[in-house]
């Protein structure tokens, strides 16, 4: 075990007279420590301000910011992406998602109710990560204050409007839970494909040999 060595500081001399106390006060007040603190204060006083005037000004949020959820629609037809599989409800650690479904005439699940209790949600993003249809994603709307509890979690609050999906004003989500670009080619490729592809540096180093050089090697 390492031995701890402590450095002993010199003990401050005791002050007995008023003259010594006055000298100590002047030394402490007009010392370098005072001017260092004043210099730092003056430097920060003239530095550019980093304060924003909220709510008139807002900082840009990251695409992977996890705030109030969004329920997506298909951009071509405007239909809901959710298929009612219930994976988001099962994986939710806060037990705040509730889905009620029924079987339709085409033997497919139809969603009757989809609610998220935002008072219990911890915005972990597991529901968006496990969704196979990319139907639920984490949005960037963090201003969700309300005086009524009933406004926290209704489906109409999360669902993207059908008009936004059909007029192409709603783009695909590129944040938390979104698949990486060119994912189809990457999934079909095997590890050997990556090995067989030569890098640019290796292709530059490899120079083709001339036929005359090959003939000379054969004669030898």
Curated annotation (Swiss-Prot):
The protein's topology relative to the membrane is: Peripheral membrane protein
Name the Gene Ontology biological process terms. aerobic respiration
Q: Where in the cell is it found?
A: Cell inner membrane
Per its record, how is this protein called by name?
Answer: NADH-quinone oxidoreductase subunit I
Q: Which reaction is the catalytic activity of this chain?
A: a quinone + NADH + 5 H(+)(in) = a quinol + NAD(+) + 4 H(+)(out)
Q: How is the cofactor bound?
A: Binds 2 [4Fe-4S] clusters per subunit.
What sequence ranges are listed for the domain 4Fe-4S ferredoxin-type? 71-102, 112-141
NCBIfam families per record: NuoI, PRK05888.2-3, PRK05888.2-6
Map out region (Disordered) in residue numbers: 189-220
């Amino acid at each position: 075990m390492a031995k701890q060595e402590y450095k002993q500081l010199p003990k401050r001399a005791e002050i007995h007279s008023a003259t010594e106390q006055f000298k100590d006060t002047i030394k402490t007040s007009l010392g370098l420590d005072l001017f260092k603190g004043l210099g730092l204060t003056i430097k920060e006083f003239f530095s550019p301000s980093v304060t924003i005037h909220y709510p008139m000004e807002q900082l840009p949020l990251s695409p992977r910011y996890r705030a109030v959820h969004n329920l997506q629609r298909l951009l071509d037809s405007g239909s809901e992406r959710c298929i009612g599989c219930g994976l988001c409800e099962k994986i939710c650690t806060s037990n705040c998602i509730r889905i009620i479904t029924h079987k339709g005439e085409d033997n497919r699940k139809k969603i009757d109710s989809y609610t998220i209790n935002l008072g219990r949600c911890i915005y972990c993003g597991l529901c968006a990560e496990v969704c196979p249809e990319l139907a639920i994603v984490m949005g960037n709307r963090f201003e969700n204050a309300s005086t009524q509890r009933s406004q926290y979690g209704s489906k109409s609050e999360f669902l993207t409007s059908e008009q936004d999906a059909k007029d192409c004003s709603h783009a695909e989500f590129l944040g938390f839970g979104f698949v990486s670009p060119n994912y189809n080619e990457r999934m079909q490729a095997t590890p050997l494909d990556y090995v067989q592809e030569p890098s640019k540096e290796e292709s530059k180093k490899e120079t083709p040999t001339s036929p005359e050089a090959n003939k000379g090697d054969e004669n030898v």
